[in-house]
Every structure is written in structure tokens, then in C-alpha cells.
């Protein structure tokens, strides 16, 4: 837990603590709370600035100091159990359900347990414990390795090259980018930080050794530039039929214009022409390449080759 989070937890517990220990001395309070006298003074000054909306003197948390003792005179309700409003509970449930369905971000069982408790506390109709989504053994192994700081061996499918490789990595953290979970890890083979998408990790197993990514890699902020528009990458102009419009939510696509028939023209960046060709073949006639011509020709050639192979394999 970060220092900021630790202080927040301490501040939230200080008012109930002082109410349970009226007229406790500063020295005793500092010792029991595990802080210095200076930190206790800073915490009390911070609490003095917290309270109910309006934030006038009568709305803020207040203390009475008698000699060296401390007593709460107005708690601003911070001593009462937290109660969520209906919109707050609904928003929290929606967020938890979304997180529970994304591999690797949270423990699915813990998330579903929290969902059931919040739904019951909020008075949801027929609140029942929801079954946690099935987590793949690979995702569970990766999450455990991150939690335990253990090195991993993974079998990873690289969509851009259509290959399955085995790699040894030192996990750093799990990231959520564009609705997908990624393992950020130090690749010993590449000697650099790499991102591995959870749904492309075919198998994973902890090694009997600690994860030892370089300290510079561990401390550096996540590099998500791959998911930003990179002007150095080639771009294709595509015409997307309404039936394939869902692809706009899953790929680095910028919509150019809507057409009268409901289709749209888009610009899509890509790093590998091989990968782009395979992707477009999967959409059939729903996605047509308008530019560049080299990519359009490559897709046509690949489609013709596939059709010829199919006809050759067909029984006479």
C-alpha cells in the first residue's frame, strides 16, 4: 500500500478511535497509532479541514484540546458505517462486474463475493451470489506470479507473426488497456520490457525463482505508446459494412466518414502487412481495402490462393 493510501486509511479511522478513547493524551495516541507526534499533529490539522458539504465551521470535523488531551466534539458522520446511495451502489456493481469479466485484473471469486455483498446491502431484488467466470489456468498462474513476484515461463501466441513461442519473463504488473488485460514483464530473451495480452497466453507456469526485472524497468511508468496513433506506422483506408462495424471498437481505427448505405470509411494503422492481410481475409466482403493498392492486391492474391486451394481439395 502506498504512503498516501496508508495515511488515508489512518485518517478514516482516527475519528472513531478518538471517540472510543476520549481525552487520550497526544503521546498515547501517537504511540497507539504508530506515528510520530509531528505526524499526529499534521493528521489532526488535515481532519480539521474535512467535513460535510457547505464546509462552514459548523460542518467540519472538530476536536477539543484540554491540556495534552484530545476529544472529538463533532464527527461529521465519519464514525457511522458507510452507506451507498442507490446510484452509487449501481455504479460500483457495474464496475465490479466489468472487472470480474476481464482476465487477470482481479480475483474473480473475490469480485463476485463483493458483488453479492454490495447487492444484498443495497437491497437489490433477489440478490444472489453470482457465479465467478471461469479463469483459465494460464491467467491464474500469471496473476499469482505477479502477486508473489515469481518468474514465469509462458507459451505466447504472437498474432502479428502467427507464431507460438515459449518465453521466460519477469513479471512487473498487470495493465488494463482498451478492455484487455496485459502482463507487463521483462523478457529475458529480448532483454527488454514487453506487453503480453492475457488471452494470447496459451500456457503459463511459475518458476522456482524470484522475478528480477531491472530496477529501472520496475520503476518506469508503463509504456502504452503502442496503443497510441503512431505516425511512423503504415495506414490503410478501409470501407467497413454495417455488419462489421464492431471492429471499430477493437482495433486502432479512426473513422473518416459515414456513407449513405450505412457503411463507413476508416483509417487503420498496422505494423505487419502479413497480419493485416490475415485480419482482412477474415472479414470477407464486409471490409474492403481502398488504399494502399499494394495491400488491396495482397488481400486479393491471398483470397484467390485460398479459393484455389479449396477447389483443389474438393472431391471430384
Curated annotation (Swiss-Prot):
Disulfide bonds: none
Designated name of the protein: Protein PafC
Gene transcribed to yield this protein: pafC
Domain WYL: 131-211
Any one cellular-component term (Gene Ontology): peptidoglycan-based cell wall
Quaternary structure and interacting proteins, as annotated: Interacts with PafB; with which it probably forms a heterocomplex.
Similarity comment: Belongs to the PafC family.
Top-rank taxon: Bacteria
Traits of the deletion mutant: Cells lacking this gene are not severely sensitized to RNI and display no accumulation of the proteasome substrates Mpa, FabD and PanB.
Species assigned in the record: Mycobacterium tuberculosis (strain ATCC 25618 / H37Rv)
Biological role: Part of the pafABC operon, but PafC does not seem to be involved in pupylation or substrate degradation. Appears to play at least a small role in resistance to reactive nitrogen intermediates (RNI) in vitro.
PROSITE patterns named in the record: WYL (PS52050)
Amino acid at each position: 500500500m502506498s504512503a498516501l493510501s496508508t495515511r488515508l486509511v489512518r485518517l478514516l479511522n482516527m475519528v472513531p478511535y478518538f471517540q472510543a478513547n476520549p481525552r487520550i493524551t497526544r503521546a498515547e495516541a501517537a504511540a497507539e497509532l504508530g506515528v510520530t507526534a509531528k505526524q499526529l499533529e499534521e493528521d489532526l490539522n488535515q481532519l480539521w479541514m474535512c467535513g460535510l458539504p457547505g464546509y462552514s465551521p459548523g460542518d467540519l470535523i472538530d476536536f477539543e484540546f484540554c491540556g495534552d488531551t484530545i476529544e472529538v466534539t463533532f464527527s461529521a458522520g465519519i464514525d457511522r458505517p458507510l452507506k451507498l446511495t442507490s446510484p452509487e451502489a449501481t455504479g460500483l456493481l457495474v464496475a465490479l462486474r466489468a472487472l470480474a469479466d476481464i482476465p487477470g485484473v482481479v480475483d474473480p471469486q473475490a469480485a463476485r463475493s463483493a458483488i453479492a455483498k454490495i447487492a444484498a446491502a443495497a437491497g437489490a431484488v433477489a440478490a444472489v451470489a453470482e457465479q465467478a467466470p471461469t479463469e483459465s489456468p494460464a491467467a491464474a498462474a500469471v496473476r499469482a506470479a505477479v502477486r508473489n513476484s515469481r518468474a514465469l515461463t509462458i507459451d505466447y501466441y504472437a498474432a502479428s507473426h502467427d507464431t507460438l513461442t515459449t518465453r521466460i519473463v519477469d513479471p512487473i504488473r498487470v495493465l488494463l488497456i482498451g478492455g484487455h488485460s496485459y502482463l507487463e514483464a521483462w523478457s529475458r530473451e529480448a532483454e527488454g520490457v514487453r506487453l503480453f495480452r492475457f488471452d494470447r497466453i496459451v500456457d503459463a507456469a511459475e518458476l522456482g525463482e524470484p522475478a528480477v526485472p531491472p530496477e529501472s524497468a520496475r520503476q518506469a511508468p508503463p509504456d502504452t505508446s503502442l496503443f497510441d496513433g503512431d505516425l511512423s506506422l503504415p495506414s490503410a483506408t478501409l470501407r467497413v459494412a454495417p455488419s462489421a462495424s464492431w471492429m471499430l471498437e477493437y482495433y486502432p481505427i479512426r473513422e473518416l466518414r459515414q456513407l449513405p448505405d450505412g457503411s463507413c470509411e476508416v483509417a487503420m494503422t498496422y505494423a505487419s502487412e502479413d497480419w493485416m492481410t490475415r485480419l482482412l481475409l477474415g472479414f470477407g466482403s464486409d471490409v474492403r481495402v481502398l488504399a494502399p493498392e499494394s495491400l488491396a492486391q495482397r488481400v486479393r492474391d491471398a483470397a484467390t490462393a485460398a479459393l484455389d486451394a479449396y477447389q483443389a481439395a474438393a472431391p471430384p
